[in-house]
């Protein structure tokens, strides 16, 4: 039996905050792997600004050097909204001997009551919550919390900084920054 942490998100772009969360949860919970699952269209957000191909390429570059980090693009292959319930149902069907843990930030903890089929989902997985500045970790739902170093970092902030040609070194893996430059993503590198 393998124990797998699931880190879902748009990863637009993937940044060091994502990697820090993944590694700290993996270590604290002694998980075998962390699977990064980019969403197609999350129910709580509008469409992403960057294509799925670019996002998966950037994730792969970001996680390449870590033997316990894997990319799983199953949600990108589905049409429409990406619901966690559908993803976990598919994963448990494909990997019945695995135990899955779904990693969420403090920003998502407070929305658990609104999640699609939350009661059924709670029977299938364990949620692992990590703190995020400005959000409460208080919930009546069963969530295992992992205390990790927090940084005020989001993909939204990084996209804005890239568009404004502001300094972002040390916030993105170098390989991802190189990819952003080469493909002129987020307005970076355009005249």
Swiss-Prot record:
The keyword Nucleotidyltransferase applies. Its EC number is 2.7.7.18. It comes from the Bacteria. Pathway: Cofactor biosynthesis; NAD(+) biosynthesis; deamido-NAD(+) from nicotinate D-ribonucleotide: step 1/1. CDD domains: NMNAT. This is Probable nicotinate-nucleotide adenylyltransferase. GO terms for biological process: NAD biosynthetic process. One of its GO terms (molecular function) is nicotinate-nucleotide adenylyltransferase activity.
């Amino acid at each position: 039996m393998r124990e797998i942490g699931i880190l879902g998100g748009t990863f637009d772009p993937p940044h060091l905050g994502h990697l820090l969360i993944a590694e700290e949860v993996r270590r604290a919970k002694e998980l075998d792997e962390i699977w990064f699952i980019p969403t197609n269209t999350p129910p709580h957000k509008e469409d992403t600004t960057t294509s799925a191909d670019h996002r998966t390429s950037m994730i792969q570059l970001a996680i390449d050097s870590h033997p316990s980090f894997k990319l799983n693009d199953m949600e990108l292959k589905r049409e429409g909204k990406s619901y966690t319930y559908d993803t976990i149902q598919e994963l448990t069907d494909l990997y019945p001997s695995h135990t899955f843990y779904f990693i969420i930030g403090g920003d998502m903890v407070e929305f658990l009551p609104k999640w699609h089929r939350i009661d059924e989902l709670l029977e299938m997985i364990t949620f692992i919550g990590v703190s995020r500045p400005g959000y409460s970790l208080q919930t009546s739902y069963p969530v295992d919390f992992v205390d990790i170093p927090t940084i005020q970092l989001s993909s939204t902030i990084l996209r804005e900084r890239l568009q404004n040609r502001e300094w972002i070194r040390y916030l993105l893996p170098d390989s991802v920054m190189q990819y952003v430059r080469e493909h002129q993503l987020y307005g970076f590198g355009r005249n």
